[in-house]
Amino acid sequence: GWQGGMEGGLAMAELLTGKGNPSGKLVDTFAASADDYPSTANFHESFDYVNYTEDIYVGYRYFETFARDKVKYPFGFGLSYTRFQTESMGLAVQGTEATVIEKVTNVGGMSGRETIQVYVEAPQGKLGKPLRQLAAYAKTEELKPGASEELILKAELTELASYDDSGVTGHKSCYVLEAGDYIFYVGTDVRSAREVGRVTLAELQVVQTVTEALAPVQAFKRLRPFFFGENKHAIANWEDVPLRTIDLAERILRERPTQSEYMGDQGWKLADVYDKKITLEQFLTQLSDEDLICMTRGEGMCSPKVTPGTAAAFGGVTDGLQQFGIPVACCSDGPSGIRMDCGTMAYALPNGTLLACTFDPELVEELYEMEGMELRKNKIDSLLGPGINIHRNPLNGRNFEYFSEDPYLTGTMAAAQLKGMGKYGVTGTIKHFACNNQEFKRHDANAIVSERALREIYLKGFEIAVKQGGAYSIMSTYGPVNGLWTAGSYDLLTTILRKEWGYQGIVMTDWWAKINEEGEPGSGKQTIPMVRAQNDIYMVTADAASNSNKDNTAEGLADGRLTRAQLMRNAANICCFLLRSVAMERLLGREEEECTELHSPVSTEGAGDSGQVLARLELPEPKTGEEIELPLEKLSTKKGTGAVYQLRFTKIGRYELVFRMSSTLGPLAQLPISVFLNNTLQQTVTINGTEGKIVEQTVILAIRQDGEKYMKLYFGESGIDMSRMFLRYVGKNDIESFRNE
């Protein structure tokens, strides 16, 4: 769907009344039936796997090549209250860059904007190609009736290269431009685009030689076009998909870093690296093995160490790490605005699909510059977005969060968001890397994909975001690709991402993700392959220091499956992120003055209902361990409601507020409760859906002064069934050091 954010209703009113003129374009092909999409046949073929048999023929690449008659509304189609006339001013080629100039004239009676799109038909060669591939797009300014604008669109020929995963061209594991005519089409959608010129290559050109990576290990067949005579409509043909030929275990072992040392505390802080007094490598030699292991664990959700109600804290999450001056960074859901489960207000932005329909990266960059300002105001270092998976099938339940069926449009839109947020020193975490193309069984369903389809379709948007948008935070997926859960996929996260693309940043798991050794089932405790693959941070744990998730990283270090050097490498990735983050500037007190002014007090009072006083309780002198029941008769746990208990404390000390609760929702549901004392947030706790099982959560309250206090509970989502709630007196021990005094 096209969710318009908090201003979407006003925009719709302007369009319906004629005050504004629509200029959006479809980012997906609309066919007559869901059954017309080639991926539908295997979309729910199995609970255990998904065969990507359509290969690179996704969306308009399929329909324009094989099934033009099935299309109701083509990719790039849009409506306007005015009419435009377009005129080609020619095609020019210089080096590897093709330039198209298109004149657009408003010949209607109302001001409006138009989008021009450039598509290329590559020669079929030995690999087979779609008949259309988006290569460039541009949008006019608002043109008054009779006004014209010349748009200059540039397309890099090397970006049109195809990946040879079989060696059929004689150049296996290479991106190649096969010999023949590259025909350029220009128009206002893929179907109406007309030929404006050709570029002819006399012989095959190797654009880039890479390494075989992430090839499938299970045999299946993939679609390729067969053309008969002069017929421009392809017939579906099928070929065997090339399988992995390299020894992955040998590659991982051969490339394993081994050099590291432990020098103990030398008195250096991360600020010394920031000030270029020492190198990062020198700094990391001070960290013990336990420190390095703790850095691989993010904490959440709703960690009290960062902005209340956010998704996770990472970096300096333990006392030991903070002693070395390592800051704690904060990340928050996204992508359509900041999510703070304590009820703090934030702007709701249009979703990814709607933003992509603008075909206007400059506008998107401007919007996300403002989002960057809001992130900085709330002391959030990364928004968990944009989501940039491909619209492989219209039945994917999360398509609204992603941009398009086209990887080029996807990548350029993601790059625009990252550039916008970057102007305020914050960033987005692009997700889900890669092939999160369905929600059903996404924790376990194995995506079986050819290496060519991965590189040309499903990884391409991420590659553009890294190379053009400067991405430096990425989230892997829940599920496996070609047998390996992505959170521990070495070829995905090291061979392709870091070695080929030159990525310098962090990778985090999705929340409570699984990882596996090849051939074994996935588990959230199996973090050894995660560390090896340079998935730097496991999201999330309740407490990094105590290994609350019971991961096996320390076990792997002890028995040689991991090295200290691998842990140091991942810690370096995390520290590099922190060194360029606002969290580091805040820790050092070095934020620019105009940025510190952003940190005006942000309300942490729960949104929605201010809360009905459910009970007034006098708490007599409690004994240590004594439990004081809180009545539940009038308690509502509906989303957005607040419940207030008026409590008179007669004894100072530490109290435990204990919730015993359940939810009939499934384990993907996230259900937060925020606890306030006299309108000051104490803590937000989050449970997942328990499928009816009762669980317990505890919030510590430090009562430093006797007398009356108002305790408010704010429920961020519906679905909690509270079975019991009580206060337990703990005593006065350590109250001076308790952080929530």
Identify the function of each model-found stretch.
Residues 1-192, 210-642, 646-656, 672-696, ...:
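Glycoside hydrolase catalytic-domain context in secreted enzymes
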Residues 109, 662-671, 719-720:
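Extended, low-complexity, turn-rich repeat/linker tracts enriched in Gly/Pro/Ser/Thr and Asp/Glu
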Residues 192-211:
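Short beta-strand elements
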Residues 193-197, 697, 721-723:
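Extracellular and select intracellular beta-sandwich modules with Ser/Thr-enriched
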Residues 659:
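Catalytic-site microenvironment of enzymes
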